[in-house]
Curated annotation (Swiss-Prot):
PANTHER family: TETRASPANIN (PTHR19282:SF544). InterPro entries: Tetraspanin/Peripherin (IPR018499), Tetraspanin_animals (IPR000301), Tetraspanin_CS (IPR018503), Tetraspanin_EC2_sf (IPR008952). One of its GO terms (cellular component) is plasma membrane. Belongs to the tetraspanin (TM4SF) family. This is 23 kDa integral membrane protein. Its main location: membrane. CDD domains: tetraspanin_LEL (cd03127). The chain crosses the membrane at residues 13-36, 56-71, 83-108, 184-205. It is found in: Membrane. Residues 1-12, 72-82, 206-218 are cytoplasmic. The lineage of its organism: Eukaryota, Metazoa, Spiralia, Lophotrochozoa, Platyhelminthes. The keyword ATP-binding does not apply.
Length: 218
């Protein structure tokens, strides 16, 4: 078998370096998912199931990227064509999954205001212990009151709407929706960075795999 030339050694180094970057990005993605999960878990009674599942899905994707990146590193170090192609295949599957997730996120981003409005209004009209506790957390955390303002309570303002004797005047719909959108943007930025490095890794891994295959058959 011929020895890999300078160009192939360069490709091998690129695959290894890109996978180290993907490993680090996956850790950031896992951290971002955990952060969002902690934040969202406080208000899960007022969230659609898609939003409740999103942080867990982000963490799972991060773990999968971590494992796949490790496979890519091993394939590059061992100059194993099969491992490199398996690595590229898994990355392609991940990219497709991430694209689907991005489409779902965009669709639900446009529906956040309507969804939160419906859920919060329903919570005020048909309260129960869990929903009331969630609304209290939202009102205390975001210094807001009701859906659009304290008038939603028709004079029976709860203690969570007050700081001392002062009643919060801002409604919770706008601030809570902004909170969800902010966290969505954070995760989207991290995911976009990961996708960029994944795409580069796929191209370079396929090139390296093909060249190694050619060298092994010289």
């Amino acid at each position: 078998m011929a020895t890999l030339g300078t160009g192939m050694r360069c490709l091998k180094s690129c695959v290894f370096i890109l996978n180290i970057i993907c490993l680090l990005c996956s850790l950031v993605l896992i951290g971002a998912g955990a952060y969002v999960e902690v934040k969202f878990s406080q208000y899960e009674a007022n969230l659609h199931k898609v939003w409740q599942a999103a942080p867990i899905a982000i963490i799972v994707v991060g773990v999968v990227i971590l494992i796949v990146s490790f496979l890519g590193c091993c394939g590059a170090i061992k100059e194993n064509v099969c491992m490199l192609y398996m690595y590229a295949f898994f990355l392609i599957v991940l990219l497709i999954a991430e694209l689907v997730a991005a489409i779902v996120a965009v669709v639900y981003k446009d529906k956040i205001d309507d969804e939160i409005n419906t859920l919060m209004t329903g919570a005020l009209e048909n309260p129960n212990e869990e929903i009331t506790a969630t609304m209290d957390k939202i009102q205390t955390s975001f210094h807001c009151c009701g859906v659009k303002g304290p008038d939603d309570y028709k004079g029976n303002v709860p203690a969570s709407c007050k700081e001392g004797q002062e009643v919060y005047v801002q409604g919770c719909l706008s601030v809570f929706s902004a909170f969800l959108k902010r966290n969505l943007i954070i995760v989207a930025c991290v995911a976009f960075g990961v996708c960029f490095f994944q795409l580069l890794s796929i191209v370079i891994a396929c090139c390296l795999g093909q060249r190694i295959h050619d060298y092994q058959n010289v």
